[in-house]
């Protein structure tokens, strides 16, 4: 699933967050965040229960993610 997570990250996240998650994008860097925290944030964005003033971008990005997508992305990002 690591490869799938890397593919999803490259397609959906890298342009704003950087190859290794170190770009702050509109909020903060992803590098160093535990997978569980990333997963909770992605679910929160999808359910529109998480995020600050600029959450609209992330809500648009995650709305099409499946539970599996969220799991593999969180696991991949947790390795940064």
From Swiss-Prot:
Task: Please state the protein's primary subcellular location.
Answer: periplasm
Q: Write out the entry's keywords from A to Z.
A: Electron transport, Heme, Iron, Metal-binding, Periplasm, Transport
Show the InterPro entries listed in the entry. Answer: Cyt_c-like_dom, Cyt_c-like_dom_sf
Q: What is its subcellular localisation?
A: Periplasm
Q: Which GO terms describe its cellular component?
A: periplasmic space
Q: Cite a single Pfam family from the UniProt record.
A: Cytochrome_CBB3
Residues binding heme c are 13, 16-17, 58
Give this protein's Gene Ontology molecular function annotations: electron transfer activity; heme binding; metal ion binding
Modification after translation:
Binds 1 heme c group covalently per subunit.
What does the protein in this record do? Natural electron acceptor for a formate dehydrogenase.
UniProt-recorded name of the protein = Cytochrome c-553
User: Taxonomically, what lineage is the organism?
Assistant: Bacteria, Pseudomonadati, Thermodesulfobacteriota, Desulfovibrionia, Desulfovibrionales
């Amino acid at each position: 699933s690591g490869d799938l997570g890397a593919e999803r990250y490259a397609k959906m996240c890298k342009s704003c967050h950087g190859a290794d998650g170190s770009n702050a994008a509109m909020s903060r860097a992803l590098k160093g965040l535990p997978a569980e925290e990333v997963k909770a944030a992605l679910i929160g964005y999808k359910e529109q229960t998480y995020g600050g003033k600029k959450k609209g971008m992330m809500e648009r990005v995650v709305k099409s993610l499946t539970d599996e997508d969220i799991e593999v992305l969180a696991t991949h990002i947790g390795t940064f």
